From Swiss-Prot:
It is found in: Secreted, Cell wall; Cell outer membrane. InterPro entries: Autotransporte_beta, Autotransporte_beta_dom_sf, Polymorphic_membr_middle, POMP_repeat. Residues 654-681 are annotated as: Disordered. This is Probable outer membrane protein PmpF. The lineage of its organism: Bacteria, Pseudomonadati, Chlamydiota, Chlamydiia, Chlamydiales. It comes from Chlamydia muridarum (strain MoPn / Nigg). Keywords: Cell outer membrane, Cell wall, Membrane, Secreted, Signal, Transmembrane, Transmembrane beta strand. GO terms for cellular component: cell outer membrane; extracellular region. It comes from the Bacteria. Residues 1-20 form the signal peptide.
Amino acid sequence: MTRRILPLSLVFIPLSCISASETDTLKLPNLTFGGREIEFIVTPPSSIAAQYITYANVSNYRGNFTISSCTQDQWFSRGLSTTNSSGAFVESMTSFTAIDNADLFFCNNYCTHQGGGGAINATGLISFKNNQNILFYNNTTIGTQFTGVALRTERNRGGALYGSSIELINNHSLNFINNTSGDMGGAVSTIQNLVIKNTSGIVAFENNHTTDHIPNTFATILARGGAVGCQGACEISHNTGPVVFNSNYGGYGGAISTGGQCIFRDNKDKLIFINNSALGWHNTSAQGNGAVISAGGEFGLLNNKGPIYFENNNASYIAGAISCNNLNFQENGPIYFLNNSALYGGAFHLFASPAANYIHTGSGDIIFNNNTELSTTGMSAGLRKLFYIPGTTNNNPITLSLGAKKDTRIYFYDLFQWGGLKKANTPPENSPHTVTINPSDEFSGAVVFSYKNISSDLQAHMIASKTHNQIKDSPTTLKFGTMSIENGAEFEFFNGPLTQESTSLLALGQDSILTVGKDASLTITHLGIILPGLLNDQGTTAPRIRVNPQDMTQNTNSNQAPVSTENVATQKIFFSGLVSLVDENYESVYDSCDLSRGKANQPILHIETTNDAQLSNDWKNTLNTSLYSLPHYGYQGLWTSNWMTTTRTVSLTNSTETQTANNSIQEQKNTSETFDSNSTTTAKIPSIRASTGGTTPLATTDVTVTRHSLVVSWTPIGYIADPARRGDLIANNLVSSGRNTTLYLRSLLPDDSWFALQGSAATLFTKQQKRLDYHGYSSASKGYAISSQASGAHGHKFLFSFSQSSDTMKEKRTNNKISSRYYLSALCFEQPMFDRIALIGAAAYNYGTHKTYNFYGTKKFSKGNFHSTTLGGSLRCELRDSMPFQSIMLTPFIQALISRTEPASIQEQGDLARLFSLKQPHTAVVSPIGIKGVYSSNKWPTVSCEMEVAYQPTLYWKRPILNTVLIKNNGSWETTNTPLAKHSFYGRGSSSLKFSYLKLFANYQAQVATSTVSHYMNAGGALVF
């Protein structure tokens, strides 16, 4: 038994090792953590190093090993085991436990014994709990060589850890870097289960791998799990930091291989699976399944809050990301499958065993983009396909549920092909192998099938190979939310019906095709046409709903003449309910699309059949094409619609060879879609024939296609702005700027000092009620003011003041707000007249900078910056000393307050951004009429109290008016403020305490009207002379 325990002094950053290189094999390695080179410095052994380490109950070199409560970093390095497992200890153990320790490092340990465990091997549980940073770097178990096909037992498992079960719980960080095993588990291998839980920092598996060391024996099956290999289940859950699997490779499961389920649950930060590979060959045949995950049971992503990335992973055979029995994605943040590849199944391989599959959004979208099949078989090469599902006959259900929650999407930018699942002696419409889209009312989002990110060359390749989105052999139901086919995508239902329930929307966009094939049907109850793409004048065509003119169930070989569907007289397309016009977000088109100009004879839908008996009875009446809309915001106008019918002849072929160079994607569209919509005669359309590599002509079949085109015209008559985006808050902000200026001027009154320097802090609260259909708001501001006063020999007084304040204004019933900063300068003078009359005048300039934030729903927002200027004036007349009442002087007064506010032009950015320009500035003149009472004591310190009340009518009022344009749709309207009451009452009270040359004061003002309540408070001090 050998024990190597050295304390370690190093600077350690618990981040993922982007690169980890060994600079000198004879010395401890330098690691590069996060771009910084970290050097290991080993100090001489000491007795402290072995604290709380026990090796108990040793029997035949097997026992329970425990490391606990070490306060110093522990280093286990350069162990070599050739006669037993466990490279760091040269012995395997019954169990291994590390608990409550400082950093633990297992580096450069090597085990050539077939028992495995490059660092640690235990026949029972391996447990790491409540430790700080844990690093397994460059540990290896490899060396046992076998030849021949009979030896199928795995050897050299677990490049770092090999145990019956492994638990890594409540540690600060876990890093498995550059570990290697011969067979299962390049870093970690278990006979039963693996649990990684409650890690506060990063969990990183990088550059781990297995080696296929049994030649020509399908050894990739054994060398599985490039980072983790479990014969049981794997659970990675409740971790706070990011979880990273980067650049691992193995035979089956480039990152993780499990015999049971593999679950990622309740993690708080990112999950990243990048650059992992499943690699292997048998003779000249490709092997290697599941570039990231190969699970014998379910693969689940459940309630993970951060974004999840599967990117740039590849498998040499099947599944560019995940190979498993079934998928379960629910309640996660956004999920991205990007740029993954495999020979078959760019993203997924499903075993086609009875199970329920769920691809549901949580708080973010799910996006599939550029997941590619690298098949070498003809036209399939290079196509972006997601699934590989082996065809099977199974009497127990294999189901798929696609669900997008409110304000989320599932985007399929790659080909979605689901099918080949059958039940014996059962017609397709009764098959238990169903697909459900948005299964319950909580799923009100959209499932989108789009060719938006597919190049025109690849689309031409797809057309030539007759490859598109499809669901085959599985009855499909669209229950809630939206299913959208757009941006040139084609979707075919084959050997199974699509049934839409009236609580959902089936949306079709530009150049899209919805096809019903042999032994299938479409039941459409609410059809949406995505209008903006049809109005862009860029050569786009209206969407099509069609019966496939070719019977794909017979005569599909290239040397056979295709069979058409013109003799199929069975009803295949059933229409009922409305046709609606929607925008790219599947919402009302009137407030998002530019309908400012009229449109005539615009095709918005084509319905194509080879036999009109394929349409439901009286379909033109059961499909409501009146385009009538309930009262709505946005453009107002009138739609008219009518049907036009034309015919054409197309030639069918069975060619799946690469098309000739002159058959571009646009040429194919022209031949299949473009014809004179005013003609009712048959037009002969040249067939698109691919090169066969020889001179033998292809067998063709001509078929007549009848097209019914829905053509509409639009006449605009006006625009009504949606109150949510009308801009009331900006106009209210201008009114508030004027009110704040006059409130300040009203309190700007000189005192009896000869000279004074004054400073104060102030706050203002305003609450505006909702009136008519205009939003109310509340605002709060705080700031400071400084002033200087001087008095002349004849009672003249001059006062200069400056104030700065910040204000936040929030609109009621929305999340819109404006943050403002104001800079106000004012000059005040007092002129005594006839001993008893005083005239007090003031002028102010108030400059404001503003940031506006507007929120629409949960994902859309706009913001903008602007500034405003306010000019204010005040003239006050007081009749003094005329009404003494004991020690209180009552003084009547009348005052005129004027303000004028103008903003600069405002242009927002973001969703639903608007442009505001000034039509009419805000001007207000109010005249408080009231009485002031003043009390002053003769004792030291002098106490003074002052109170005034007034009735304040509005003498002149001009509402601010802004010309507003919604940039997205060119809709325009006028924006103004929430109506205000014309009469209000005003009160002010102040108190001061004077100590010789120091005066302390506080005052409060309130203005009350039926529409608005304002409270102004300030307090401060002054030096008076």
